[in-house]
């Protein structure tokens, strides 16, 4: 039997524990056929990953569910409770009356009775049937942050998701949500890496006891939308060389030392192991100071989700100026 990676966990404010490393299932087109993708995910499970991050808009829920079922049926894992499965409510379903049906559809795709974590994907709403990333002004609808969160709380009370949270929420939008929340968001999943450190959001979430989870911790290196600002950063390259680590390990260790978890995706088995070999060593204060000097810039502005005649008119408004 091949060796399995060991994953530390973080206890969320919902009293549930989440593995600090999640395997991302957002895959650029063309997405492999169902059976092929399920086989890929099953190999990831064999390596030892148990936290999987998906979303209704990724088109990967069904394949992930199939892999989870195969892992349980084959005895590779002891049962559903070994997994931590996250999915997300897409913007077209971000309405109080649409959330429960959307969650039930996600559970059906996955073949599961409950999610470990359900996130609001973005703080906005679009018309159902809108063409992905080709939105017109008619597609943008008012977003009821209070009603949407109330429906998320109901899903939690029904036992359909153990924890609920948000994704891509600024401090200001989180503050507005918290005004009426009876259940705190357990997680805010956001873009976070050494070139976008979330220096404003991270302390805010820590103060509110909301865990921050990083997507794009390496700027999606190796994908069609990748950038090299992390993996070819000279500060990280030098630190990695001095510590006999990979650049990715240094970048991920930095995120871990900020108290955040992260979502990774690689189909290279060696890197699957390398990316979690970050928990038994530390960055020095000098190295942290060097990383602190790296210029900052948000990489994904989500320009497609704003419209000058819509509820959110600019990226500045979407991110509340935190660019």
From Swiss-Prot:
EC code(s) of this entry: 1.1.1.440
**What is known about temperature dependence?**
Optimum temperature is 42 degrees Celsius.
Keyword set includes Magnesium: no
Any Pfam family: Aldo_ket_red
SUPFAM superfamilies noted in UniProt: NAD(P)-linked oxidoreductase
Please name the pathway. Answer: Alkaloid biosynthesis
Q: Which residues form a coiled coil?
A: none
**pH-activity note:** Optimum pH is 7-8.
A GO biological-process term:
indole alkaloid biosynthetic process
Record's keyword terms, sorted: Alkaloid metabolism, NADP, Oxidoreductase
Q: Please indicate if the UniProt record lists Zinc-finger as a keyword.
A: no
A GO molecular function assigned to this protein is: oxidoreductase activity
Q: Which reaction does it catalyse?
A: rhazimol + NADP(+) = rhazimal + NADPH + 2 H(+)
Site (Lowers pKa of active site Tyr) found at: 88
Q: What do we know about how this protein assembles, alone or with others?
A: Monomer.
- Family per record: Belongs to the aldo/keto reductase family.
What's this protein's function? Answer: Oxidoreductase involved in the biosynthesis of akuammilan monoterpene indole alkaloids (MIAs) natural products, components with various biological properties such as antidiabetic, antibacterial, anti-inflammatory, anticancer, and antimalarial activities. Catalyzes the conversion of rhazimal to rhazimol.
Record-given protein name: Rhazimal reductase 2
Native organism = Alstonia scholaris (Dogbane)
Q: Which gene encodes it?
A: RHR2
């Amino acid at each position: 039997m091949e060796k399995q990676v060991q994953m530390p966990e973080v206890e969320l404010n919902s009293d549930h524990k989440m593995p600090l490393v999640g395997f991302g299932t957002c895959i650029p087109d063309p997405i492999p056929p169902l059976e092929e993708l399920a086989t890929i995910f099953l190999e990831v499970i064999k390596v030892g990953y148990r936290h999987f991050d998906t979303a209704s808009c990724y088109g990967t829920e069904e394949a992930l569910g199939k892999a989870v079922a195969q892992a349980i049926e084959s005895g590779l894992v002891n049962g559903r409770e070994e997994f931590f499965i996250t999915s997300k409510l897409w913007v077209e379903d971000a309405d109080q009356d649409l959330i429960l049906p959307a969650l039930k559809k996600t559970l059906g795709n996955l073949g599961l009775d409950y999610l470990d974590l359900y996130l609001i994907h973005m703080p906005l709403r679009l018309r159902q049937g809108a063409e992905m990333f080709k939105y017109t002004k008619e597609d943008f609808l008012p977003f009821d942050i209070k009603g949407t969160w109330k429906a998320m709380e109901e899903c939690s009370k029904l036992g359909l998701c153990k924890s609920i949270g948000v994704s891509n929420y600024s401090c200001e939008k989180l503050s507005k949500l918290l005004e009426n929340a009876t259940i705190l968001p357990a997680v805010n999943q956001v873009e976070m890496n050494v070139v976008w450190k979330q220096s404003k959001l991270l302390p805010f979430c820590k103060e509110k006891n909301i865990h921050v989870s990083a997507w794009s911790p390496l700027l999606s290196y190796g994908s069609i939308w990748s950038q090299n600002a992390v993996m070819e950063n000279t500060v990280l390259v030098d630190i990695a060389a001095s510590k006999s680590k990979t650049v990715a390990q240094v970048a991920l260790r930095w995120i871990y030392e900020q108290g955040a978890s992260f979502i990774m995706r690689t189909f290279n088995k060696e890197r699957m192991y390398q990316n979690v070999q970050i928990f038994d060593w530390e960055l020095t204060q000098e190295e942290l100071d060097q990383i602190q000097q790296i210029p900052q810039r948000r990489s994904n502005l989500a320009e497609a989700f704003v419209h000058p005649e819509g509820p959110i008119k600019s990226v500045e408004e979407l991110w509340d100026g935190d660019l």
